[in-house]
């Protein structure tokens, strides 16, 4: 998400975590991307889905980011993508101890389904992508500590609604958040809830 991707200096979350823990941290955040796959036609060869969390994890597992390097995104806010993807391709994932996955706001914006009634590992759904991510990472890196971070509470000025009111097709944002929290608990995976617990959001003045 851009919450992480657009802040890459000493004030970034990765930099703060590195300062506090002494661990070497890398910010692999890519703004505007989704956790699950989003192509409406479900084309596995759709290259933009390779920068989703599900697509990136597949590359972590096979240790090959070649597909991501073919993605061409023209928006100026994504000018750091090329360098970030190049850096990810140089990381020795066998040495990675902790992986934070903070995503989901764009799944909500896209109206992606939360769950599939047919395939629990359907990566075109929010929960299916989480299950697939956890399964693949645990199979490839059994000692890796996986920590999900929920989307934050969000206001919209056009229309003037909060995420509690704004349904973009898949439900309100809290539906995604609660599904993520419940699923992570069921999978015995850590999750940090920044939707409910991070900052006050009772009134518009809190914005």
Model-derived features with residue positions:
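Soluble non-cytosolic domains of exported or imported proteins
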Residues: 8-12, 120-128, 167-174
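Solvent-exposed loop/turn segments at secondary-structure junctions
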Residues: 2-5, 30-35, 105-110, 152-156, ...
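Serine-esterase "nucleophile elbow" of acetyl-processing enzymes
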Residues: 1-50
